[in-house]
């Protein structure tokens, strides 16, 4: 099974081969015999497939719409659009793995060894990519607003493209354990499961991967977002540009939503690590953490459904893209043979109008920052 945070196919209680962080057993045989998790397993077989299916449907619809609208209606690839495109692709690849895990949890792994590795690796890469691209978007706004860096220059565009490539490469490197250790395993009753088998080093690997997720997947991105948006807020308060209040509310909302979606899950993982280290715990605590992990994991996975709303649909400019796209589709549906070049051209012109929003506030705010900076130097 995937080793990062992916849904664990519900194995028999006390399976010592399972090295996913979503384990239902303790590390020593004596405790395994005492702490039965049959109720937890039964709950997961019903709850998780339903949640994974909802995430698949909502995430697929939202991110596919985001991707199509950006590709069709965006007049030129601004920096934010590039990040949104990559975020949409990452989210789509992430939600594509959900049906596989839903079937695996409800029944068992039926897709063979090759897909076991592919789906696990695909899950892990895009799990981190989604978080990293959100962080990059906050960095992009920070550079554009606080440091008034014009992002349309070739040097800035090259830097952003390099950063996008680095995000994919870094996520791929983090997912190496999925490629190496994940494989299918057959239980005594002939049921197949897909998970990582670290052999005698399972405990060390599980703890390492959990702490890695806590650090790279939550703590560092959260601190970066707090720093970037705090500095953005200070600049907006000082310069008082048009749309300041809405921009500040959006900045605060982005940080709060990220925290609310990811903190419960990462806290539960951290407590599970302490449980495995025997810092505290008994069977009752183990049961509660198992239930909590299933719920908080589902909440965290829903990030791929919320990000299109937060980072795109709250933008006036994107809503204009969407309106132009829907107008073209409606016109094509009503009269498939009617030329729509004039309409498309006018839609693109309309989409290029300058509007203040969280996703494009930098373009207006950086100009105000530069103008006021020049006035201060005179």
Swiss-Prot record:
The chain crosses the membrane at residues 50-70, 92-112, 118-139, 162-182, 217-237, 250-270, 293-313. Residues 1-49, 113-117, 183-216, 271-292 are extracellular. Keywords: Cell membrane, Disulfide bond, Endosome, G-protein coupled receptor, Glycoprotein, Inflammatory response, Membrane, Phosphoprotein, Receptor, Transducer, Transmembrane, Transmembrane helix. The keyword Hydrolase does not apply. Phosphorylated on serine residues in the C-terminal cytoplasmic tail. Residues 326-378 are annotated as: C-terminal cytoplasmic tail. It is found in: Early endosome; Recycling endosome; Cell membrane. Atypical chemokine receptor that controls chemokine levels and localization via high-affinity chemokine binding that is uncoupled from classic ligand-driven signal transduction cascades, resulting instead in chemokine sequestration, degradation, or transcytosis. Also known as interceptor (internalizing receptor) or chemokine-scavenging receptor or chemokine decoy receptor. Acts as a receptor for chemokines including CCL2, CCL3, CCL3L1, CCL4, CCL5, CCL7, CCL8, CCL11, CCL13, CCL17, CCL22, CCL23, CCL24, SCYA2/MCP-1, SCY3/MIP-1-alpha, SCYA5/RANTES and SCYA7/MCP-3. PANTHER family: ATYPICAL CHEMOKINE RECEPTOR 2 (PTHR10489:SF942), CELL ADHESION MOLECULE (PTHR10489). This is Atypical chemokine receptor 2. It comes from Mus musculus. The lineage of its organism: Eukaryota, Metazoa, Chordata, Craniata, Vertebrata.
């Amino acid at each position: 099974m995937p080793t990062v945070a992916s849904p664990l196919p519900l194995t028999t209680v006390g399976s010592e081969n399972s090295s996913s962080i979503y384990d239902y057993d303790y590390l020593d045989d004596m405790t395994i015999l005492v702490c039965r998790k049959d109720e937890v397993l039964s709950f997961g077989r019903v709850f998780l497939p339903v949640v994974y299916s909802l995430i698949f449907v909502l995430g697929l619809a939202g991110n596919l719409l985001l991707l199509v609208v950006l590709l069709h209606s965006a007049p030129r690839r601004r920096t934010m659009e590039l990040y949104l495109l990559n975020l949409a692709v990452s989210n789509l690849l992430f939600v594509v793995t959900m049906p596989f895990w839903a079937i695996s949890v409800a029944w068992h792994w039926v897709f063979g060894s090759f897909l076991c590795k592919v789906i696990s690796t695909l899950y892990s890469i895009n799990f981190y990519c989604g978080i990293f691209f959100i962080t990059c978007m906050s960095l992009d706004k920070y550079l554009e607003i606080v440091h008034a860096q014009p992002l349309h220059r070739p040097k800035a565009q090259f830097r952003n493209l390099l950063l996008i490539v680095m995000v994919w490469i870094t996520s791929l490197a983090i997912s190496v354990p999925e490629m190496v250790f994940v494989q299918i395993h057959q239980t005594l009753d002939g049921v197949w499961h897909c998970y990582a088998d670290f052999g005698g080093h399972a405990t060390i690997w599980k703890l390492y991967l959990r702490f890695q997720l806590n650090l790279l997947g939550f703590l560092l991105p959260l601190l970066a977002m707090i720093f970037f948006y705090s500095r953005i807020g200070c600049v907006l308060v000082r310069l008082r540009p048009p749309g300041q209040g809405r921009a500040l509310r959006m900045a605060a909302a982005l940080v709060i939503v990220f925290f609310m979606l990811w903190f419960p899950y990462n806290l539960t993982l951290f407590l599970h690590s302490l449980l495995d280290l025997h810092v505290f715990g008994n069977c009752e605590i183990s049961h509660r953490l198992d239930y909590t992990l299933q719920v908080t994991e589902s909440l965290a996975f829903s990030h791929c459904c919320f990000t299109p709303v937060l980072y795109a649909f709250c933008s006036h400019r994107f809503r204009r893209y969407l309106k132009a796209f829907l107008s073209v589709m409606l016109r094509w549906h009503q009269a498939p043979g009617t030329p729509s070049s004039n309409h498309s051209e006018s839609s693109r012109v309309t989409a290029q109008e300058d509007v203040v929003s969280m996703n494009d506030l930098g373009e207006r705010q950086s100009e105000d920052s530069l103008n006021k900076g020049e006035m201060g130097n005179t």
